[in-house]
Each structure stands twice: as structure tokens, then as C-alpha cells.
From Swiss-Prot:
CDD domains: Ribosomal_uS17. The keyword rRNA-binding applies. Part of the 30S ribosomal subunit. One of the primary rRNA binding proteins, it binds specifically to the 5'-end of 16S ribosomal RNA. One of its GO terms (biological process) is translation. Belongs to the universal ribosomal protein uS17 family. GO terms for molecular function: rRNA binding; structural constituent of ribosome. The gene is rpsQ. One of its GO terms (cellular component) is cytosolic small ribosomal subunit. Keywords: Ribonucleoprotein, Ribosomal protein, RNA-binding, rRNA-binding. The lineage of its organism: Bacteria, Bacillati, Chloroflexota, Dehalococcoidia, Dehalococcoidales. This is Small ribosomal subunit protein uS17. SUPFAM superfamilies: Nucleic acid-binding proteins. NCBIfam families: PRK05610.1 (NF004123), uS17_bact (TIGR03635).
Length: 86
């Protein structure tokens, strides 16, 4: 495990207890056609205090495995998001 590996993304879902889903946009280049395309990587992140909400921009840090798919934890909330009711 790499030390101090951090990423910045936005919260997609906060419906689980102590867990949030974070989306991180990644730009990749096709190896043959050289076209750049975007993908959103989704990570399960441990949020001990349930403080992050949908739309927040957050920083996550890699940690020991907490469950089968959860090995990132919330480091800090950079900006609070706002939810627009439809």
C-alpha cells in the first residue's frame, strides 16, 4: 500500500451508514485511436461521522481495508455542495 495516497472527488451517494460513494473524473487516451475520453471512477469511502453530503468536494486517503470494497477514508471536506430539488 502506498503511503499518503490521496485523491479529490465529489460525493455521488450518501445513503449508506458510515459509507459514501465518491466519483473521480479520469481522462484517458485510447491506445490505438489517440482519442481522449472521460470516465468516472467510483470509490466506496469510509465516513465515520456521516458528515459528507451529496455534491460535496472532498479529499480521500488510502487506508487499510475496512470491508471487501472499502479501503479509502474521508480526509477532509474541501467545499460543501448544494442540492437543488427537482
Amino acid at each position: 500500500m502506498e503511503k499518503n495516497k490521496t485523491r479529490i472527488g465529489h460525493v455521488i451517494s450518501d445513503r449508506m451508514e458510515k459509507t459514501i460513494v465518491v466519483g473521480i473524473d479520469v481522462a484517458k487516451r485510447h491506445p490505438l485511436y489517440k482519442k481522449t475520453y472521460r470516465r468516472t471512477m467510483k470509490y466506496l469511502v469510509h465516513d465515520e461521522k456521516n458528515e459528507a453530503k451529496i455534491g460535496d468536494m472532498i479529499e480521500i486517503v488510502k487506508c487499510r481495508p475496512i470491508s471487501k470494497g472499502k479501503y479509502w477514508r474521508l480526509n477532509r471536506i474541501i467545499t460543501k455542495g448544494h442540492i437543488v430539488a427537482a
